[in-house]
Amino acid sequence: MDEFAKLFIELVEACHAHERYRDLECINLIASEGLKSPAVREMLRLCMDLESRYSEGENDLQGRVKERYYQGQKYITVIENCAADLVKKLFNCNWTDIRVVSGTHANLATFKGISNVTKNRKMVVAPLSCGAHISHDYTGLAGQVLGLEIINLAYDVEELNIDVDKSSEIIRAARPGLVTLGASLFLFPHPVKELKSVVEDVGAYLVYDGAHVLGLIAGGAFQDPLREGADFVTASTHKTFPGPQGGLILANLTDERMEKAIKGVQHAVFPLSTSNVHLARLPAGEDLAKQTVRNAQAAGQYLYEHGIKVLGEKKGFTRSHQLAIDVREYGGGKKVAKDLEEANIIVNKNLLPYDDQNNRENPSGIRLGFQDVTRRGFRESDIEHLCDLMLSVIKGKRKPAEVREDVIALRKQFNTIKYGFNSIEEAMKYLEEAN
């Protein structure tokens, strides 16, 4: 057998092994991952031909297709327009761009478009160690790709949130073109309403990165940033909003100021950063959103009561799907995440607000997300069982390899994906009966 054939066989075997490992044998607590329903998986199989097609073109100020540059687009255009209209109805806005392929791409287009319109290269954001996504930071997309000057908001470590008074002073002094809220470590709603007036006073646009909490927003279980004053919401479609990998941008076209910005963002999407639109990746309900938050809060309470330093105890630990846990006492984030991985409990190491943001390799904390286990049907009592398994690993009471068998056994009890439809037919029947 030649080397090419060996590599191909290894590739196929690794794909099968991954499916068994992560889908059947692990409990996934990565906060940035989601779980697709059977109906969504069926929809992806239904539209396989879309993956082979190009559909570049311009959109209008409602986010619908304006002009195509390729032929054979009549049904692709219907699909894109329907998807855009569904997004606008779900989030109660009058403009969206669904062509971006990730949350980071949504940030790229929004930051680029607005900075071009304002001719202002300054952006004020939360510090990286306090939860900001790498794409907001001077070390990431905003600084290294777009060349923006990054200025940090003030952060209250006790409240685990942005300090409104000090941040208002920073915004007034900096006079940026962009102020970005939202985060990658995102436990509590950010002060959108509280900062809106000062952002307007300096002529800036307020962007809210809702990648982690989009499904919670859709389900009414978190803040509603557009209603609170955000000019743009950027997001990904595969975290608490449990669809395939993708991105979107939301806004309301209300005046000439917003029209200029939307046109700038659309230009940054196409032609600046997108050629083809990957429609094959396009897709939460209220019950799912609320149960996800309840599960996260239950885990926070249980772990805290058993001696683990869970951040945010005075505020109920979290109002999102996430928990932040200080594990320095047990060897730090890198060690604990690795130990839990050996037990088939998948989490990630994470900087905490008081960490040196250059210490990403071994931060103080780990981040947990409960959207995946909630989708599988975990309730509060199941979460406590899971926490017991985590505690036995974190505190070194049992070897991870021993705990692994219990984790696999627990995972096998939850084989049905909840809060969704089992087929396209079931979804269509439900919608027909509801109307």
Predicted segments with their positions:
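Short acidic (Asp/Glu) and glycine-rich catalytic loops that position anionic groups and cofactors
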Residues: 19-25, 52-53, 62-63, 176, ...
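Glycine-enriched alpha-helix->loop->beta-strand junction motifs that scaffold or abut catalytic
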Residues: 229-231, 344-345, 364-366
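Conserved small-domain helix->loop->beta segment predominantly found in fold-type I
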Residues: 284, 289, 293-338, 346-362, ...
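PLP-dependent enzyme catalytic core of the Aspartate aminotransferase-like
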Residues: 294, 298, 359-435
